C-alpha cells in the first residue's frame, strides 16, 4: 500500500527499497569495512533473497522520466542514475513492477548486525484463501454500497495494489479521490493487514490541516474503496521539476509544513517511513496552495523505545539506520532532510549509478555544498541540512528542533514548546469540558468503528501496563513520562479525575477513548444527532433535566449539579435543551465546569494541530 496516488502523478523516485539489487562489495574493500559496511552487507543478503530469479546483475534498459505535462500512467519503478543529474528531470528510471517488501517490525534490540546472507531463491508467499472473493475479508465489517453514494470519473493514478479515480458524491456533487484496492492483489495476510493499518492511521491523524483526510472506507466483492479529499494541485515533486529549485524563503515555508507533519505524526505514535516529494500534494494549482501529506501505506504505529528492522522506504530518502535494520521515528527526520536538500538544490544529496551505489552513498557519502546553487545558499540553510542528515539518529535533530532552527522560524520566532503527546494534549482539552459534554463524547466514541479508534487503542495498550483494561494513576504517570510529558503529580491527578467520569478510581477503555478522541469527530452531523438522540429518551426533540439526570445515573456520574449544566447549554432559558443548543455546546470551545483546575487551560493556547 506504499504507492497511494491521490491526484495526477509523474514521479521519479517511486520504488521501495525492498525491490533494490544490492551487489557484493569488492574484495579489496573488505579490510576497511566499518559497522555500517557490515550492516549494508546484511541488507544485501536480505534484499537479494527477495528478488525473483528474473532479476539480473546487469542494469536494465533506461526509460527517461517524462517532462512535466506529459500524460503518462503512474507506475511503480526502480531507480537508476547514470550520472549526477543537473535537475531531478535527468534521473533515469526503470519501468518495472515493485517487489513487495515483508514488513515485520521487531521491538527486541539486537546485539549485533545480521551476518551477510547468501543469495537464495525467493520465499514463497502465503496466500490468503479466496482473499479476493470473500466478503468482509479486509475491513472486517459490513459497509454500505459504495456505488450508491459515489460515481467514478477519470483515473488519477495507478499504484501496485490500487487505482485512484476521481469520484463525485451523488447527493452533493462534491469531488473526492477514490483509491480502489483490488482484493485479488492482496496475496498474503500481511497485505490485508497493511490495508487495514493504512485506514486506521489515516483516521488516527484526521484533523491535521496538512494530512489528507479520509471520508470513508467501503468494501465490495472485488475491492476496497478509500474515499479521500481530492488534491488537484499536483505533487510537490512536479513543482520542484518545474522550478529547478525553490527560493530559500519558499523552501523554509515548505519545510515548516513538512516537518510540522512529522512532529504531529510522532506525537500520535505514528512513523510515516516513506516521506518523499511525491507523497506531498497541493490542494490546488494556486501558488500558495495548502500542502497535504499522503500515502500511509508503509506507516506504522510505534511506542517509545521500539526498534524496527524491516527495510522499507524509497532509495534516495531512506535513512542509514533503516539500511542497518535498526531504527525508529528519527528516520523520518532524515527523509525530511533529504527533501529540504532537494528543495534548495533540485537534486538529491546521495546519488550513484546503481541503487547499490545510492545505498553506499547514504551510508558513507559526503554532502555536496560546493556545486551550484549551494555557494549562493545561506550558511543557516546548510547548517540545518547538515543537522538533519547526521547519520547517528541520537545526534540528529528532532522534528521540534528543526522547527526551532533559525532558518525555519517565522520572523525569528520559534515554536514556544514541542507538541504535547496526543494523549496529554487531548486529555487536557477533555478535562476542561463540563460533564454533559464528556458524556456526549462517550456516546460518540462508542458509535465509532474499530478502524477509527485503532490508533487510540494502541495508546491505551501502551499505558495499560498490566493489561487489566483499566489505567491506574501510576500507569498514567508512567505512560505520560514515556512520551516525554513533564507534569507534577497534582496535574496528573487532575487529568485522571477528569477522565474518570464514573469516579471508579481508574480510567477504563471507553473513558480513555472519549477523553482522547479528536474533536473533529463531533463535526459529523450523524455523530451529533446520535448523541442527542441518546439523551432525548422520549424522542420529544428536547433534553429535559430529568433525562439529563437519568443519563448521569447511567454513566455513574455523581456530584453533578443538573441545574448548572442545563443553564450552561439552555440558551433561550426555556428549561430544556433543543438540538441546536446541543450542537452549539459540542462545537464551541471547552466549557469549564466541574472540579478541574483552571491552570490546565493555559495549555490550550499551544498551536496544536493534531
From Swiss-Prot:
A lipid is attached at residue 2 (N-myristoyl glycine). Ca(2+) 1 binds at residues 464, 466, 468, 470, 475. Residues 17-133 are annotated as: Disordered. Coiled coil: none annotated. A lipid is attached at residue 5 (S-palmitoyl cysteine). Ca(2+) 4 binds at residues 570, 572, 574, 576, 581. Changing residue 436 to A: Abolishes activation by calcium. ATP binds at residues 156-164, 179. Residues 414-444 are annotated as: Autoinhibitory domain. This is Calcium-dependent protein kinase 1. Residues 451-486, 487-522, 523-558, 559-592 form the EF-hand domain. The gene is CPK1. Its EC number is 2.7.11.1. Residues 150-408 form the Protein kinase domain.
Amino acid at each position: 500500500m506504499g504507492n497511494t496516488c491521490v491526484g495526477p502523478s509523474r514521479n521519479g523516485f517511486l520504488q521501495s527499497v525492498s525491490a533494490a539489487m544490492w551487489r557484493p562489495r569488492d574484495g579489496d574493500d573488505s579490510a576497511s569495512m566499518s559497522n555500517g559496511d557490515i550492516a549494508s552487507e546484511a541488507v544485501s543478503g536480505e534484499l537479494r533473497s527477495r528478488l525473483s530469479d528474473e532479476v539480473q546483475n546487469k542494469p536494465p534498459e533506461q526509460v527517461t522520466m517524462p517532462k512535466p505535462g506529459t500524460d503518462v500512467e503512474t507506475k511503480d519503478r526502480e531507480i537508476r542514475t547514470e550520472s549526477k543529474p543537473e535537475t531531478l528531470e535527468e534521473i533515469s528510471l526503470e519501468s518495472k513492477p515493485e517487489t513487495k517488501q515483508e514488513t515485520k517490525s521487531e521491538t527486541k534490540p539486537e546485539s549485533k548486525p545480521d551476518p551477510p546472507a547468501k543469495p537464495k531463491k525467493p520465499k514463497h508467499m502465503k496466500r490468503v484463501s479466496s482473499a479476493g472473493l470473500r466478503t468482509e475479508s479486509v475491513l472486517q465489517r459490513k459497509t454500505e454500497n459504495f456505488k450508491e453514494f459515489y460515481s467514478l470519473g477519470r483515473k488519477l493514478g495507478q499504484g501496485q495494489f490500487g487505482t485512484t479515480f476521481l469520484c463525485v458524491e451523488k447527493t452533493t456533487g462534491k469531488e473526492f479521490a477514490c483509491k480502489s484496492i483490488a482484493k485479488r492483489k492482496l496475496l498474503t495476510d500481511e497485505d490485508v493487514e497493511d490495508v487495514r493499518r493504512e485506514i486506521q492511521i489515516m483516521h488516527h491523524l484526521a484533523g491535521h490541516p496538512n494530512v489528507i483526510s479520509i471520508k470513508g472506507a467501503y468494501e465490495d466483492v472485488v475491492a476496497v474503496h478509500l474515499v479521500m479529499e481530492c488534491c488537484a494541485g499536483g505533487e510537490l515533486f512536479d513543482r520542484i521539476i518545474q522550478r529547478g529549485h525553490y527560493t530559500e524563503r519558499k523552501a523554509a515555508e515548505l519545510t515548516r509544513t513538512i516537518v510540522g507533519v512529522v512532529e504531529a505524526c510522532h506525537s500520535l505514535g505514528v512513523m510515516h517511513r516513506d516521506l518523499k516529494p511525491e507523497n506531498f500534494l497541493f490542494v490546488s494549482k494556486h501558488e500558495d496552495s495548502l500542502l497535504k501529506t499522503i500515502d500511509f501505506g508503509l506507516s506504522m504505529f510505534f511506542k517509545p523505545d521500539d526498534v524496527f528492522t524491516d527495510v522499507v522506504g524509497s532509495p534516495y530518502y531512506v535513512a542509514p539506520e533503516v539500511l542497518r535494520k535498526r531504527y525508529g521515528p528519527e528516520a523520518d527526520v532524515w527523509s525530511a532532510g533529504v527533501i529540504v536538500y532537494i528543495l534548495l538544490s533540485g537534486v538529491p544529496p546521495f546519488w550513484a549509478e546503481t541503487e547499490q551505489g545510492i545505498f553506499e552513498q547514504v551510508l558513507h557519502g559526503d554532502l555536496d555544498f560546493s556545486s551550484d546553487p549551494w555557494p549562493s545558499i545561506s550558511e543557516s540553510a546548510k547548517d540545518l541540512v547538515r543537522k538533519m542528515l547526521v547519520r547517528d539518529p541520537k545526534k540528529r535533530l528532532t522534528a521540534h528542533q528543526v522547527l526551532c532552527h533559525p532558518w525555519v522560524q517565522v520572523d525569528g520566532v520559534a515554536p514556544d514548546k514541542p507538541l504535547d503527546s496526543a494523549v496529554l494534549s487531548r486529555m487536557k482539552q477533555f478535562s476542561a469540558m463540563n460533564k454533559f459534554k464528556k458524556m456526549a463524547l462517550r456516546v460518540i466514541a462508542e458509535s465509532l468503528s474499530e478502524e477509527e479508534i485503532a490508533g487510540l487503542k494502541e495508546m491505551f495498550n501502551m499505558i495499560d501496563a498490566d493489561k487489566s483494561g483499566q489505567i491506574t494513576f501510576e500507569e498514567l504517570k508512567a505512560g505520560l513520562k514515556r512520551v516525554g510529558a513533564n507534569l507534577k503529580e497534582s496535574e496528573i491527578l487532575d487529568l485522571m479525575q477528569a477522565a474518570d467520569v464514573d469516579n471508579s478510581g481508574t480510567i477504563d477503555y471507553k473513558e480513555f477513548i472519549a477523553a482522547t478522541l479528536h474533536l473533529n469527530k463531533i463535526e459529523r452531523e450523524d455523530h451529533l444527532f446520535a448523541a442527542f438522540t441518546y439523551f432525548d429518551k422520549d424522542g420529544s426533540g428536547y433534553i429535559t433535566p430529568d433525562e439529563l439526570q437519568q443519563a448521569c445515573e447511567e454513566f455513574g456520574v455523581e456530584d453533578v449539579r443538573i441545574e448548572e449544566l442545563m443553564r450552561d447549554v439552555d440558551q433561550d432559558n426555556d428549561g430544556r435543551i433543543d438540538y441546536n443548543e446541543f450542537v452549539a455546546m459540542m462545537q464551541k470551545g471547552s466549557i469549564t465546569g466541574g472540579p478541574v483546575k483552571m491552570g490546565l487551560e493555559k495549555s490550550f493556547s499551544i498551536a496544536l494541530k493534531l
